């Protein structure tokens, strides 16, 4: 390969990586902002109950956050300290699921994680769709672990994003978490 061809290919790939990174960052940040808004609503209410008022507030937040316009996001759910779904943005009555054994739940309950936690890709216990879970914990008014707010990005979103780019022959994209866990491979 000639030097000018190599330089062009390098520049094109750098631009491609930058565009993909920006799109991924925007998506994950949008989901996180939705989770933050729900956590703040729960903590400011001073209670966690599956009341109609709380359910309506959850739907309102999810509906008006920009992330709902994305086909990437599944439902946002609120999970109590025992790991049970108690509020569900996608259903009047929360669908039954327990996530007490999942890494994103244990990070908050057992290890006191602060901030956003990106879980291992897993099939949703509610829909069965392979997803990347994103969670934020919340506290009770007494400062104890109250549960988590969970959103999930469908793995098909990543594959669709990567497929929309002409990667060229024998090329691929891998997306990893900070600890090396593969999120998506295309």
What are these model-derived regions, one by one?
Residues 1-50, 68-74:
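Juxtamembrane extracytoplasmic/periplasmic/luminal helical "stalk" adjacent to the first N-terminal
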Residues 10, 28, 51, 55, ...:
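Solvent-exposed, acidic/flexible segments
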Residues 47-48, 88-91, 186:
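Short acidic, glycine/proline-rich loop/turn micro-motifs
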Residues 58-62:
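N-terminal post-signal-peptidase region of extra-cytosolic proteins
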Residues 67-75, 82-165, 169-172, 178:
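Extracytoplasmic/periplasmic ligand-binding sensor regions of membrane-associated signaling proteins
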């Amino acid at each position: 390969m000639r030097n000018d061809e190599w330089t062009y290919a390098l520049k094109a790939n750098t631009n491609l990586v930058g565009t993909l990174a920006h799109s991924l960052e925007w998506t994950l940040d949008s989901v996180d902002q939705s989770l933050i808004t729900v956590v703040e609503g729960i903590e400011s209410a001073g209670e966690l109950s599956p009341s109609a008022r709380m359910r309506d507030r959850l739907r309102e937040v999810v509906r008006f956050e920009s992330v709902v316009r994305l086909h990437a996001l599944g439902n946002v759910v609120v999970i109590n300290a025992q790991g049970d779904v108690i509020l569900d943005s996608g259903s009047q009555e929360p669908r039954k699921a327990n996530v007490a054994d999942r890494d994103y739940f244990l990070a908050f309950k057992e290890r006191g994680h602060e901030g956003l936690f990106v879980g291992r890709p897993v099939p949703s216990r509610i829909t069965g769709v392979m997803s990347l879970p994103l969670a934020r914990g919340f506290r009770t008014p007494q400062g104890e672990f109250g549960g988590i707010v969970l959103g999930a990005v469908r793995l098909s979103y990543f594959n669709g994003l990567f497929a929309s780019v002409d990667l060229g022959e024998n090329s691929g994209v891998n997306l990893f978490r900070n600890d090396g866990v593969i999120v998506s491979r295309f």
